[in-house]
């Protein structure tokens, strides 16, 4: 029995240590008061929550990147039933700088109807990821 255990121990490969994936911390800074803009921000936060590359943080000083989002209803001043069906959003991607102003990376201006926010949030998250990956590739050179 001892010989069998020794033979098994000699042929068994040791377990590999788990691979630790660093998830870049992102802070979402938002001013979305219109219902469609609020829903867009919520969908973007959902994408961040389930990301394998990024993680949300609640304190901007803990972030590596800051995504700033301001939304408004373009029909807010309209008379009638047009309000509440779309949003206009200004989005910025910034590199967090705890010693002063953040470093600007990229910006987007978006217009979305209520029925398009799922798609828009996915596309925006993909665009943010592409800009971060591009920045990382440039820094690595």
Model segments located where?
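A generic structural signal for ordered secondary structure
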Residues: 59-61, 127
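A structural "domain/chain start" motif
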Residues: 8-51, 133-141
């Amino acid at each position: 029995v001892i010989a069998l255990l020794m033979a098994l121990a000699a042929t068994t490969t040791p377990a590999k240590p788990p691979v630790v994936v660093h998830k870049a911390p992102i802070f979402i800074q938002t001013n979305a008061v219109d219902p469609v803009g609020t829903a867009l921000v919520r969908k973007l936060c959902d994408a961040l929550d389930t990301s394998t590359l990024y993680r949300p943080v609640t304190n901007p000083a803990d972030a590596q990147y800051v995504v700033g989002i301001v939304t408004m209803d373009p029909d807010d001043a309209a008379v009638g039933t047009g309000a509440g069906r779309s949003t206009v959003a200004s989005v910025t991607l910034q590199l967090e700088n705890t010693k002063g102003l953040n470093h600007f990376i990229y910006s987007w201006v978006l217009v979305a109807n209520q029925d398009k926010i799922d798609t828009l949030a996915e596309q925006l998250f993909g665009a943010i990821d592409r800009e971060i990956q591009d920045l990382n590739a440039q820094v690595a050179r």
